[in-house]
Each structure stands twice: as C-alpha cells, then as structure tokens.
C-alpha cells in the first residue's frame, strides 16, 4: 500500500505500471539532470548534494561528462552511509558499477577519464519499465536479510479477498451473502473492484445513466475509482431502491455512511504493506512513492539517448566544480559472490584522473557482507570551507585542498537543512533581498526591485547562510514571538519582492501545504527561497522538491506512514499466530521487531524508542478515590497508591536532587514564560492606549469640523422630537391632499358646466333662430322634448307676428340637428379637457404621495430599535463606561454646545442684517438674480421654516416634472440662492396684494357699469367725475401670455432652488443626534416655529385663495365682455341683414340720414370742443407728451429722447416732425388693454404713481417723480395727462361711434394685440353696418360716459371717428412763432410696443401735415392730429365749421371694407 522502494533508475521497481514518474516536467534538478541528444546541461552548484552510501550508485558527474545511471535494485537496508569529508561535495568521481542481478555491466569511471582511456558511455536499461514477474524489490530485500542471518517478519500470505464478518444493517443477511459471492467472483484475490468492472455490473440493472452516475457518487466514499465490498453492497442497495420505484437520496444517512466507512477502514488495514522499512535514508530519490507521499524524490529524469561525444564537446562541457576530499574506493568484497552470482568486484581506485595516488590515504575495501566501516581519513574533523576547482582549456586541475584538513562531514540528506554550504562565490543579491524585506520605517512609501533580480546559480536546497538570513527576517517580523507569521504580514513581506500575483500565489501554496493560512519559520524559509530563486530567473516548481520540504512536515508524514504500516503488519501477524486472543497474557512484545530507525541489525538496535514503550498504570501516583472505600471482597480493588508511595520512598538522594533540579528548571521556565507574557501584555496595553488616544484625537477633530461646518445646525433633524414633529406635519399635509384634489375636481366640473352653458349662450346669439336657443328645463339644464315643442311654438308665433306686422319671417339658419352636433362637439371638447385635467390632477396627486413617502422614509430611522436606542442613549449619557471615556464624552458635549451657541448667535445676526438690507431696497426695481454658485455659509437656512420651505420646493419640483411630462414645460431660469428667493417671494406677496386691491377697485367699477348697462338707464355725462380713470379693457392675449410667463418663471425658480436643496438634504441625512439635555428646549423651539409657520402658511393660503377668486372673477368678466361683444355683433349682423333686405325701400331715406349725420357731427364737434378744452390747455405747438416731459425730467432740453420707447428707437426720428400731437382717444385706446394685465413685473414697473385706485379723482394727476424709459411707464404718464382732460358736459358725444385710431390700415404696431376677437368686434364694416349704427344711435338715448370710456376703439361698432383737433390749431400751425418748439414725441408707437409682438413691423410714417387745412386723405389713413390749443368751454360754431371744412366730416362716410384684414397695410398715394 505504501511503496518505499529505493531502486535506482532503470530498476525493476523504479516506476509503477502506468504511473508517470513524479517531477517529469522539471528541467532543473540538482543531480539528476536530463540530457537530450547532443546537448549537455550546464551543471549547477547544489546545496544538498546526494552522496554515495557504500554501494554502486550512479550519479551524474559534476564535471559534466555524460555518465548514465546504473540500475542496481539493491536495497538500502544493510549498507551504511559513507562519509566523504566534505559537505555539499560533488558525488564520488570514480566508482565501479556493482552487479545487480539484472544484467552484467561494464565498469565506469566517474569524473574525468584518464588520458589513456577514452570515455566510455554505457547504454543503461530504460527506466520506468513495468514490474518484472521474476523478483520484486521486496523479495530482493528479504533475500539480503536471509543472507545476513537476520530473521525478518514473515511476509503476509495472500489469502484472497477477505471480507470482514460484519453485518450491514441496511441490507438483509441473504442479500449481503449474495453480494459477497458476486463481489468475490468479480474481483478474485483483490480487495477492491475496479471502476470498469463495477460499471459492467451496474449497467445490468438497466437504469438510466443519470441514476447510475448518482449511485456511483454515493457509493464511492473513498473517491478512489474503486469499490470496496461495503461500497459495492451500498451500490447494489441503491440500485434496488431505484428499481423498486423509490427516489435516490441526495446524501446518505449518517448510519449507512458510518457503517460503510468503518468497514472500508477495517478492510484497508488488513492490506499488508509489502515494502520494508528503510533502515537508513540515503540520497537516492524514491521515484515509486505516490504523488502526495513522495517527499524526498526529485523529478525522475527521462532516459537520454546514447551519444558518443567528441573531445571538443567534452572540453566545452567542463566547468568549474567544487571538489573536496578524494573519493574512496568502495565496492563489494572480491572474494564473495552474493546470491549465487559470480561477480568479482575489485576495489576501484578513485581520485583525480591522471594523477598518481601519492596521498597518504589508501583505498579501503568495504566488503558487501562485512560490517560497515568508515572510509577516508579517520582523524579529527575540522570544518573545511568549499574549495572551488576549475579546469581551464588545458584541463589542468586547480586547487584541491590539503588532504590533512579534510574530514568526513554529513552527507546532506535531502531536507537536512543547515548542513549545505553555499557556493564559494556566495549567494548574489541575498543581502539586498534581506534589506528589502526587513521591517523598516517608510517601507510603505514604495519599493524598488532594482538589484534583486539576477541570473545566479542557486541550488534547490537552502544553504546555511540563506537559512540564517531567512530566520533573521522571520524573527524581525515576528515581534511577539508567536512562532508564525500570519497571512497579512506574509503578503506584506512577499509583496515587496516585486513578483507578480500569480507567482506569489503559487509560492504560498507550496510553502503552506496544510492550508493553515500562516507560516512557521521553516515554511517561511521555503517561501523566501522560492522567491529568491524566482528573482534569479528560476521558474516556480509545481511540486515542492524534497530538498525544500521542511523537516517537521517530512518527519511527521514519514512517522504517520510508518505507524500505519506497523499497525497493519502487526495486526496481520497477530491474527496469523493467534496472539490476539490474549494480548495481555502473552508477555511478548512484538514491537521489538519494529523501530523507527531501522531493523535489528541497525547500529542503534540497543537503544529504545517509542515503539518499545509500554504504559505502566501502577507508576501513576496521586489521589485515588477508591482508597477510602474498601468494603471486604465486595468492594472495589484497592488503589495502587501504596506501591507508588513506596516507589517514591525508595528514591535515592541523587534522584531526589535530580527531581528538585528538574522542578526548579520547570519553575524557572514558568517564571520566564510569565514574564514574557507580562511583557507582551504590557506592550499590547501600551499599543491599545496609543490607539485609543489617537482615536479620541480623531473624534475630537471630526467633532470640531462638524460643529464649525456651515450646515452644522441641520443635524438637529436627527433629533427624535423634531423628527416626530416633522412626521406629524407631513401627516397633516398628506391628509389635506385628498381634500385639495376633490376641490380641484369639483372646480373642474364647475368649469366644464360653465363652458357648456357659455357655449349654449354663444350659440344662441350666433344662431338666434336655431333650435339650440332653447332653455332646458330638464335635470342639469338638459333640453327635453317639451322644451323643443315650446321652442317650435315660440318660433311659429314669432313668424306669425312678423307676418301680421308686415315684416319678413325670421329665417331659420340651421336645423335642430346642426345645433345638436355643435353642442355635442363642444361637449366632447369640454370632456376631453376635463379628462386631461383630471389626469394631470391624478399625476400631481401621485407625485405628492410619492414625495410624502420618500420624506417619511427619510424621517423614519428603520435601523433603530428600542435596544439600539437605549444603548445609544446610555453611551451619550456616559453610563457604564470608564472615567476616561466619560470625561471625553462630557468634553465633546461641552465643546459642541459652545459651538452651537456661537452658531446660533451668528445666525441671528445674519438674518437681521439681511432683513434690514432687504427693507432698504427700492420695491419697484427687481435686480437680476446673479447665478448662485457659492457656498451656503451665509445662508440663514438654519431654522425650521427653511427646512419646511426646502421640502415644499422639492414637492413643487416633482409636481413641475409631472406637469412638464403632461406638456407644460417650465421656463428655465438661472438658479437663485435662498436669500434671493426669499426676497423675491416677499416682493411678489406685496405685488399680489397691490394687484388685488387694484383689481377690487376695477371690479367694482365694472360691476357698477354693468348694472347701469343692464338697467338701460344712461348715466348723465355731467355727473362723470373729473379725471376718472377709464375701466379696464377686456383681457388680451398679452395678458394671458404674461400670466403664463409669470407661472413659468416661478416654476423655473422653484426648480432652480431644488438643485441647491439636494446637497442640503444629503447633509441633513448625515447629521448627528443632538444631546439629550437639549431635547426639551429644542422641542419647544420647534413647536413655536411650527405654530408661526402654520400661521404664515394660513395667511399665505388665504391670499392665494383670494387671488384665485380674483382670477376666476376676471375670467368670468372676460367671458361676459366677450359675450356682450358677440351679442352686439349679432345685433349688428341682424340689423345689417334687415337693412340689406330693405335697401331699396331705404334709398330715399339715405339722403335724410346723411343730413342727420352732418347735424350729429356738428353737435358732436361742439360737445367735444367743450369737454376737451382743458385737455389741450397747452402751448400752441406743444403736446401732452411735451408738457409732461419737462415736468418729469427737467434737465434734458429735448424731451422726446427719454420718452421714446426702447424697442423702436429708429421710428422716433421720421415721425417727430410730422406728428405734432397725440390724440387722447389714441392714448386711451393704447392704454386700455394694459389695464387688465396680470403680469406682476409690468404692474410693478408700469404703475408707480397711478396704480392705486382713485375713488375721488382730481382734475389733474401729478406724474411720477422718477422718469423711466419703460414704454409701460410712459403710457401711464400719458394716461395721467389725458384722463383729467374731460371737463364740462358733452351730451352728444358718442365715443362708441368714433373710428378707432388703431384701425388705420397702415399701422400694424398700433393695433390692439392682433386679437382675432378684436378684429371681428370692430363695427366699422360695410356701409350697412354704418348706416344701422347711425340710425339706431340717433334713436337711442345718450349713453353714460362711464360706458363710453370703458370701450376701447377695438370694441366700437360705429364708423364715426372723433378728431379732437379744432380748426384754429390747424390754421395756426404754419403761423407759429419764430422760436420753434422742440420736436414732439412719436404718436402711439410707445403704446404699441408692449402690445404688439417683438417681431411686429414698425408703422410707416404718416403723410406730412400741410400748412393749411388738408384735403381728405386716402381712406383708412388718419390725419395728423393737430396740437390741442382750444380753451376750456370753447364751443362756438366757428370752430365746428372750421373742423368740418377741414374735411373731418367727409372721412366719416368712407366705407371700410371688411373683406380684408383690418391690420393689413396699404400703399399711400
């Protein structure tokens, strides 16, 4: 079972059949090099060189001659090792081959051949041949023992396959008997069944391949590829399980596994070991050992091919080799013929070839059968250093050393460390490697492998110098003398060598064969030696060579193998002799035949070792519990303590003294161990104390950094009280979300119903005779069949009444189906919008819920439990800790509290300063926010409100993202800081409040006007307050655009603030929990801040609700105004249709109407001259803008320059000379659209002085003290100057019949916002509409001035245009004084700038004003307004006639073609 044959190369038992000799792949081996044909390997100096041990042993010569190994086959049991006197020397140079019994061989000379004899090369027998049936190595060893008279133990007799008589519990007795018979018939004399045979038997069961594979895996418990009988029985049992339909288990039960393994062990110990114990280990490698047990064998060389080298090759192959003592003649005695073979072996002279034996040493016969004798010089043995020799080209030997000083030395058994000397040249770079790997300060900074690598010749074995260096390294790194180096330390050491990771992994695997994760001193030396070899170019071996196996490992493995062999052979012999029946009664020790050191003929046979030890139970002394109870014969046997007492009393004085000395030595050793342990403990304590102090210093530094960080106050969020408060607040907000969502849905439903109702009203106005003009009386305002019947009856009555009155019957424009289709289409649109809004509401609700969950998760500390919280509080309170740690914790708390108080004081000072600076800023000017990229150190974001605001901003960000996903893209804006955001929000609140007040006043005025209009009672023009501000114009597209821009800007600002909040939120998560003693105070502060925040939030929500109501009312007002416009248009169309039908009958009435028109214009001119007198109370050549400019800005002499709008600076120059003044109607027309703008920036900038409502108007309003180039600001100034111009009464003035100023076809920039609704609303269409307006305007009573002023020119349905310029001004224009006035400002361009789009074309200049009364200009082109100079109350006929003569009245009868766009330009003549 354990092969330990020491056969040579080519022997009969040198290799097992089919087994690859180990280390076949190794190329560099110390003494068994492989020589391919025609190539000689360069010899290497070896550390542990094999030595000849007394019989012929072919070794490769160190001189490089191609000497082939000789197969001998002789056992190593009887010959003693020969000492050559020089450790590490080359093998014996000249020995005669010994007869081996295999084949006769010619003698060979080792070393350099003599001069007279050419080198002879033998062709040895091939190694690795299969075993010969004639003789085995064991039989040859036994034959040697027989010849020497020794009595070896009887060899085990082959008794066939023996199966122990053990009953297996998992099968029946009958099945076990059948399985035994089948197993014996299949294996014969073997104890195991091969895998192939087992496969044939198992395939007969006809099971599937997967089942058989699983059965084999479960059965082959030894994983050897063979089955013992219990394994075979288990396989049969598992096959039976599968054949009966049951499933195979994944793992065997413990009982079955134990039974099978126990029986396998019993069978294995019955197998005898046929190999004898080696008496003496030699340097001959054992090539027959298994892979894991051959600890001594180098790789088996391959058999080289015979080749006859030439002399030149021999000369080239000779290199310097260390030589020492001359070899001694060995061999068998010539007069003995062993084993029946005639072999006359004479002693063979050795030594240096070609030199006479002039030394004092004579060859000594060593006889094979004689006693072992030492050879060579037998005098004293002083150590001799290695002496290098070398043969130059002339083959002259160099120094060989003196013969007198050479003595026999140990031979260097493989693995016998410390007895191999280094080469004479020393080991290069070894000191550099030592210095590199030694622990030293600063080694972490890097290392260099320069100087470590080389190409030195390094032997396999570790030399004494190397071992000393490696031991020093080990002790330097093993500071606590633990006896080993851990993996981390070894990685640090080995990593400094510079080798790559793969090589270091392989080296570690070889050095740590037991996989313990650490290295002792010997294993560390092995690893360092392999690293040293690798640095010098040698590859890392795949298997550890025998020279490098540590002695501890090798001896332990050999001892285990020997004990197993002894046990098995002893058990077998005792079974054969029957001695096992009474093992304690025989009195014979069979252990005398065995020894760890060798057989009975070994020199140490008289010495006892562990194999002869026998335990003596009576020798044990001490207390015996049975000594106190001796009850006659029934009791237990008396204790043998008396005999031990007697044995101690019989000790002599010397023995007692010896015991005392031993005890003293043990006590000293114990004291030394205690001192060493105490020193180690002190060192550990000092190290722990240093580490603790270093850690406390680091904690202090980190705490100081936390306390001084700008965001240090945010760590209060980790406080449990504040976290709970935030949770409650978050829960309150979550509870409000469903209510807000339901409110939004209710508002959406109301909006949808209002839209449907509005559509019904509009459709009824657009189609007055349609079936849709039916008031539904059903549920929800639905139209029932009864309503339709009533509507048809009403239509028939109207038709009959028209027929009776002589009027044509009202034509039905569409049928009921068309009205239903329109309603259905509008309902579908409304429903789609409502569903879209509902989806947006759901998305916003989901995003709010997701954000609330994320906030709740962030506020909820999942990892915290009651136990951890309790332990944390105990640690913070310094409970259960040492005094040093308690003082340290209290010191940290004091420092943190001081820093917190200091931070709070700084934060209180910072907001007050920022607040003061905010108050000092002008409220009307908003500086552009600079991009915020700085730190947050100056931010007052250390309060509860700031954190809540940040959370609100994050929620708004999510909502904005959902809105953006729905198609509403927020406007991108540069990010702003928290201070800027707070300032902006404050200004917005002030502006919203101001706008709310203004809109309240405007809404009240609109309500009063609407009530008066619905009652139909015209207000007296004389009661109009002087300077009353006109009501707001209907909403425009620009107002809606400004509102959208405002919301987008706010969303972008919120989104920009969220980016900044992200970093703060991350810092909040990492904050520390505050001290326990501050909890109560912080809770009170948090509660107060929460109450303040709730109050502020409620106020803000109230303001927001008020603003929302105002916005809603504004929308309703817009819808009502639009409805009124559509109703007026419908009435105009209706009248137009009637007039078109009766145009033939009214032909005669046209002349009368023209006369009425002239009279009406004359009356209108008279009233307008009376009312507008104070408005034009300016110098003759001045204008309102010119009079305002000096008051607003006195220093610049030309006032038009600052009054010109920035968007159109190029238009002011050509228009200044040709436009003397701006009419008040144009001013009012240009100002009225802006009255309803919701843009906060426009409201803030454009209303510095007149934005406040004026319930008690004054005659004149002082303009703002500050002049602005903003067009909106200038419009407000013009409004101030033109509004109080109406004094007196003008009963016949019809502002609604004035032709709008912006209806001139060449001005696109002066039109009102290019609104399609406004285009349709203009009543200046065809002549029929003009006539109808004139006709019904003269019939109706005069309208109140409030209604007249409210209407912008875009809403006037009549074509009559008002020209307030009197004739005297037109006549006085050419006769102006010599001092010409400054050029007037441009006409309504500044008013058009904010209304029109940015890309609107500039208006062309009007025609030049003639010096005298101009003729009527082309149709649609307004005349240049004359400068107002008429005094107040000047209403004489001369002025009116002069204005009529100027052509004013003639323009009013021009037909305005509505087939073209009202905003299109015309080419002037």
UniProtKB/Swiss-Prot annotation:
What the entry lists under SUPFAM superfamilies is as follows:
EF-hand
Per UniProt, what is the membrane topology? Peripheral membrane protein
Pfam short name (any one): WH2
Q: Which GO terms describe its biological process?
A: endocytosis; endosomal transport
Cellular compartments per GO CC: actin cortical patch; endosome membrane; plasma membrane
Composition bias, kind Polar residues: at what positions?
54-83, 323-346, 391-401, 634-646, 1264-1284, 1456-1469
* Major localization class: membrane
**Chain intervals with Basic and acidic residues compositional bias:** 818-845, 943-961, 981-1016, 1039-1106, 1117-1137, 1144-1161
* Domain WH2: from-to ranges: 1436-1453
Low complexity composition bias: residue spans = 17-52, 85-124, 347-366, 908-917, 933-942, 1210-1227, 1368-1378
Give me the stretches of Pro residues compositional bias.
Answer: 298-307, 1193-1209, 1379-1391, 1400-1430
Q: Secretion signal: which residues?
A: none
Looking at the keywords, is Repeat present?
yes
The keyword Cytoplasm belongs to this UniProt entry's keyword annotation:
yes
Question: Where is there biased composition of kind Acidic residues?
Answer: 1162-1174
The record's keywords, sorted A to Z, are: Actin-binding, Cell membrane, Coiled coil, Cytoplasm, Cytoskeleton, Endocytosis, Endosome, Membrane, Repeat
Coiled-coil residues are: 641-767, 973-1172
**EH domain: which residues?**
175-263, 466-555
Q: How does it assemble?
A: Component of the PAN1 actin cytoskeleton-regulatory complex.
Known function: Component of the PAN1 actin cytoskeleton-regulatory complex required for the internalization of endosomes during actin-coupled endocytosis. The complex links the site of endocytosis to the cell membrane-associated actin cytoskeleton. Mediates uptake of external molecules and vacuolar degradation of plasma membrane proteins. Plays a role in the proper organization of the cell membrane-associated actin cytoskeleton and promotes its destabilization.
Family designation: Belongs to the PAN1 family.
Q: What is this protein called?
A: Actin cytoskeleton-regulatory complex protein pan1
């Amino acid at each position: 079972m354990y092969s330990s044959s020491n056969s040579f190369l080519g022997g009969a038992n040198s290799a097992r059949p089919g087994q690859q000799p180990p280390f076949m792949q190794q190329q560099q081996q110390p003494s068994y090099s492989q020589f391919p044909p025609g190539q000689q390997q360069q010899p290497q100096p070896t550390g542990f060189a094999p030595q000849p041990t007394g019989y012929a042993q072919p070794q490769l010569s160190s001189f490089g001659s191609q000497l082939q190994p000789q197969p001998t086959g002789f056992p190593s049991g009887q010959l003693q090792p020969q000492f050559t006197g020089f450790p590490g020397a080359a093998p014996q140079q000249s020995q005669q081959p010994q007869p081996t019994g295999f084949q006769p061989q010619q003698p060979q000379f080792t070393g350099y051949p003599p001069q007279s004899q050419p080198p002879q090369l033998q062709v040895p027998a091939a190694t690795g041949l299969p075993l010969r049936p004639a003789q085995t190595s064991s039989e040859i060893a036994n034959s040697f023992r027989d010849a020497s008279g020794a009595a070896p133990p009887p060899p085990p007799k082959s008794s066939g396959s023996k199966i122990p008589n053990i009953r297996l519990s998992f099968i029946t007795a009958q099945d076990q008997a059948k399985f035994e018979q089948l197993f014996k018939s299949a294996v014969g004399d073997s104890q195991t069944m091969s895998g192939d045979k087992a496969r044939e038997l198992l395939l007969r069961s006809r099971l599937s391949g997967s089942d058989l594979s699983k059965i084999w895996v479960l059965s082959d418990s030894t994983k050897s590829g063979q089955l013992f009988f219990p394994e075979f029985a288990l396989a049969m049992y598992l096959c039976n399980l599968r054949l009966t339909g049951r499933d195979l288990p994944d793992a065997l039960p413990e009982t079955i596994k134990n039974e099978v393994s126990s029986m396998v062990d019993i069978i294995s110990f019955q197998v005898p070991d046929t190999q004898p114990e080696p008496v003496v280990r030699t340097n001959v490698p054992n090539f027959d050992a298994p892979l894991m047990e051959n600890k001594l064998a180098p790789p088996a060389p391959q058999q080289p091919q015979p080749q006859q080298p030439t002399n030149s090759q021999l000369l080239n192959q000779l290199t310097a080799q260390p030589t020492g003592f001359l070899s001694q003649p060995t061999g068998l005695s010539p007069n003995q013929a062993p084993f029946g073979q005639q072999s006359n072996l004479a002693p063979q002279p050795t030594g240096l070839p070609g030199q006479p034996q002039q030394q004092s040493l004579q060859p000594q016969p060593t006889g094979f059968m004689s006693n072992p004798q030492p050879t060579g010089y037998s005098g004293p043995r002083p150590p001799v250093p290695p002496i290098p020799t070398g043969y130059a080209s002339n083959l002259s030997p160099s120094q060989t050393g003196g013969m007198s000083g050479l003595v026999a030395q140990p031979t260097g058994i493989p693995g016998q460390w410390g007895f191999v000397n280094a080469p004479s040249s020393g080991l290069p770079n070894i000191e550099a490697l030592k210095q590199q790997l030694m622990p030293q300060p600063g080694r972490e900074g890097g290392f260099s492998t320069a100087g470590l690598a080389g190409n030195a010749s390094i032997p396999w074995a570790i030399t004494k110098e190397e071992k000393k260096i490696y031991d020093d390294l080990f002790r330097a790194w093993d500071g606590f003398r633990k006896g080993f180096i851990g993996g981390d330390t070894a990685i640090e050491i080995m990593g400094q060598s510079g080798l790559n990771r793969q090589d270091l992994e392989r080296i570690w695997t070889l050095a740590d064969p037991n996989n313990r994760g650490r290295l002792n001193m010997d294993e560390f030396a092995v690893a360092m030696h392999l690293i040293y070899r690798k640095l010098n170019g040698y590859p890392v071996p795949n298997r550890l060579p025998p020279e490098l196996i540590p002695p501890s490992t090798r001896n332990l493995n050999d001892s285990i193998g020997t004990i197993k062999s002894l046990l098995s052979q002893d058990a077998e012999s005792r079974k054969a002799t029957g001695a096992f029946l009474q093992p304690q009664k025989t009195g014979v020790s069979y252990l005398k035949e065995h020894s760890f050191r060798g057989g009975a003929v070994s020199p140490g046979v008289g010495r006892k070792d562990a194999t002869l030890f026998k335990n003596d139970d009576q020798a044990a002394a001490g207390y015996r519990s049975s000594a106190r109870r001796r009850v006659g014969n029934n009791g237990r046997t008396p204790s043998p303590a008396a005999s031990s007492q007697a044995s101690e009393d019989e000790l002599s004085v010397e023995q007692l003294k010896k015991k005392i000395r031993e005890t003293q030595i043990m006590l000293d050793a114990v004291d030394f161990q205690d001192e060493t342990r105490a020193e180690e403990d002190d060192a550990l304590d000092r190290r722990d104390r240093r580490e603790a102090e270093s850690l406390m210093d680091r904690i202090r530094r980190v705490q100081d950094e936390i306390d001084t960080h700008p965001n240090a106050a945010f760590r209060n969020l980790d406080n449990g009280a504040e976290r709970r408060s935030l949770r409650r607040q978050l829960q309150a907000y979550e509870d409000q979300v469903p209510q807000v969502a339901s409110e939004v849905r209710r508002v959406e439903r109301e909006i949808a119903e209002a839209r449907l109702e509005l559509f019904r009203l509009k459709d009824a106005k657009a189609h007055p005779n349609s079936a849709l003009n039916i008031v539904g009386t059903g549920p929800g305002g639905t139209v029932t069949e009864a309503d339709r019947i009533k509507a048809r009856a009403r239509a028939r009555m109207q038709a009959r009444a028209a027929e009776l009155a002589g009027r044509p019957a009202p034509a039905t424009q569409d049928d009921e189906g068309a009205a239903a289709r329109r309603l259905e289409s509008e309902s579908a649109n409304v429903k789609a919008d409502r569903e879209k809004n509902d989806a947006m509401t759901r998305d916003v609700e989901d995003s709010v819920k997701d954000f609330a969950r994320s906030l709740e998760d962030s506020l909820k500390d999942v990892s915290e439990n009651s136990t951890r919280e309790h332990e944390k509080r105990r640690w913070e309170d310094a409970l259960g800790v040492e005094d040093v740690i308690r003082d340290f914790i209290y010191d940290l708390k004091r420092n943190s509290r001081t820093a917190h108080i200091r931070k709070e004081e700084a934060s209180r000072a910072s907001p007050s300063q920022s607040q003061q600076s905010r108050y000092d800023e002008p409220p009307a000017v908003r500086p552009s926010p600079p991009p915020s990229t700085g730190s947050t150190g100056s931010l007052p974001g250390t309060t509860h409100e700031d954190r809540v605001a940040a959370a609100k901003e994050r929620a708004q960000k999510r909502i904005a993202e959902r809105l953006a996903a729905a198609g509403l893209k927020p406007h991108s804006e540069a990010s702003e800081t928290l201070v800027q955001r707070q300032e902006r929000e404050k200004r917005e609140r002030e502006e919203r409040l101001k706008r709310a007040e203004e809109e309240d006043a405007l809404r009240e005025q609109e309500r009063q006007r609407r009530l008066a209009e619905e009652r139909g009672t015209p207000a007296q023009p004389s009661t109009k307050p002087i300077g009353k501000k006109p009501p707001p114009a209907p909403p425009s597209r620009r107002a809606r655009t400004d509102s959208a821009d405002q919301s987008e800007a706010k969303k972008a600002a919120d989104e920009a603030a969220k980016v900044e909040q992200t970093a703060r939120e991350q810092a909040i998560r990492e904050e520390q929990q505050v001290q326990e003693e501050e909890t109560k105070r912080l809770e009170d502060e948090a509660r107060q801040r929460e109450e303040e925040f709730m109050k502020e939030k409620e106020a803000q929500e109230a303001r927001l609700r008020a603003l929302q109501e105002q916005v809603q009312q504004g929308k309703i007002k817009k819808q009502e105004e639009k409805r009124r416009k559509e109703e007026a248009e419908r009435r105009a169309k209706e009248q137009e249709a009637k007039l078109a039908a009766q145009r033939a009958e009214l032909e005669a009435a046209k002349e009368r109407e023209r006369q009425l028109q002239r009279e009406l214009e004359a009356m209108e001119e008279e009233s307008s001259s009376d009312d507008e007198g104070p408005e034009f109370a300016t110098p003759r050549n001045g204008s309102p803008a010119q009079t305002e400019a000096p008051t607003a800005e006195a220093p610049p002499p030309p006032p038009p320059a600052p009054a010109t709008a920035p968007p159109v600076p190029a238009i002011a120059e050509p228009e200044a000379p040709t436009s003397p003044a701006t009419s008040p109607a144009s001013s009012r027309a240009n100002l009225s659209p802006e009255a309803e703008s919701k843009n906060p920036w426009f409201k803030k900038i454009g209303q510095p002085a007149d934005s406040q409502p004026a319930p008690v108007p004054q005659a004149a309003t002082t303009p703002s003290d500050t002049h602005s180039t903003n067009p909106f600001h200038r419009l407000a100034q013009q409004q101030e100057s033109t509004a109080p111009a109406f004094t007196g009464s003008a009963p016949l003035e019809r502002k609604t019949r004035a032709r709008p100023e912006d209806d001139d076809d060449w001005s696109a920039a002066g039109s009102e916002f290019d609104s399609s609704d406004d285009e349709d609303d203009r009543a200046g269409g065809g002549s029929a509409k003009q006539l109808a307006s004139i006709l019904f305007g003269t019939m109706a009573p005069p309208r109140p001035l409030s209604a007249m002023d409210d209407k912008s020119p875009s809403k006037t349905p009549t074509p009559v245009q008002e020209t307030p310029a009197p004739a005297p001004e037109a006549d006085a224009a050419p006769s102006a004084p010599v001092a010409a006035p400054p050029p007037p400002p441009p006409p309504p361009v500044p008013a058009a700038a904010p209304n029109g789009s940015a890309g609107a074309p500039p208006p062309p200049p009007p025609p030049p004003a003639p010096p005298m009364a101009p003729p009527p200009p082309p149709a649609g082109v307004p005349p240049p307004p004359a400068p107002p100079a008429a005094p107040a109350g000047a209403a004489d006929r001369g002025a009116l006639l002069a204005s009529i003569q100027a052509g004013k009245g003639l323009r009013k009868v021009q037909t305005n073609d509505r087939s073209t766009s009202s905003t299109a330009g015309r080419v002037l003549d």
